[in-house]
């Protein structure tokens, strides 16, 4: 249960996991911040979603299909379309979640996304975004099977550099990592290793001490071996 956000997760006896959420609305104190949540009608709930494809609902009472933003049309076209012009300014992490969906499901961003995203990538907007949320969204992205495609989409949009100060390294080093527990953290360290100033980026992301120590040890070992990860 997450009372503050009005959400819960239920594991049914036969193994199915169901996420439940109250109909609610969110208010962002500043761009990228954790939202303040309160109960609201379903119409208000849908208008806060990231993209039209996840702004659809079914009224279980009358089985009416609610699709105020053309989500079914965009779903059929495999398009990720934000709901309003300030969607990314309101929450810059929306583009990271969108890149994950696009990479995982073979979707693409709507043609207006680069134009709508540009104001959200301005330094003054990024400076106000929650670094903890940015970090968590990056880690979730690195857990994806198609994580490199998601990173490439973010790089293509200019979001990887603007939001994280990261350049996209070659894919080959990542392919050598085997799937195991903690894989997203290993991918994150490898991603940081290929930056011009890995420790500065790690500090900016406010990584836990154990990860920064691990990165420092990795860098020291590479220096000793006469190697460099910077691109």
Task: Describe every region a protein language model picked out.
Residues 1-231:
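Catalytic cores of the polymerase beta-like nucleotidyltransferase superfamily
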């Amino acid at each position: 249960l997450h009372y503050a956000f009005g959400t819960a997760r239920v594991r049914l006896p036969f193994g199915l996991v169901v996420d439940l959420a109250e109909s609610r609305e969110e208010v962002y104190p500043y761009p990228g911040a954790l939202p303040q949540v309160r109960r609201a009608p379903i119409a208000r709930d849908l208008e806060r979603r990231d993209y039209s494809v996840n702004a659809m609902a079914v009224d279980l009472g009358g089985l009416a299909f609610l699709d105020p933003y053309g989500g079914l049309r965009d779903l059929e076209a495999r398009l990720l379309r934000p709901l309003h012009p300030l969607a990314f300014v309101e929450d810059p992490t929306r583009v990271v979640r969108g890149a994950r969906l696009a990479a995982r499901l073979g979707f693409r961003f709507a043609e207006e996304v680069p134009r709508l995203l540009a104001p959200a990538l301005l330094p003054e907007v990024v400076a106000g975004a929650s670094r903890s949320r940015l970090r968590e969204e990056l880690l979730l992205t690195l857990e994806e099977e198609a994580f490199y495609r998601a990173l490439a989409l973010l790089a293509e949009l200019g979001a990887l550099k603007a939001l994280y100060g990261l350049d996209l390294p070659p894919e080959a080093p990542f392919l050598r990592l085997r799937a195991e527990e903690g894989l997203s953290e290993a991918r994150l360290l490898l991603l940081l290793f290929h930056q011009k100033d890995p420790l500065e980026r790690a500090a900016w992301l406010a990584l836990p001490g154990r990860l920064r120590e691990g990165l420092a040890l990795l860098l020291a070992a590479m220096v000793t071996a006469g190697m460099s990860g910077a691109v």
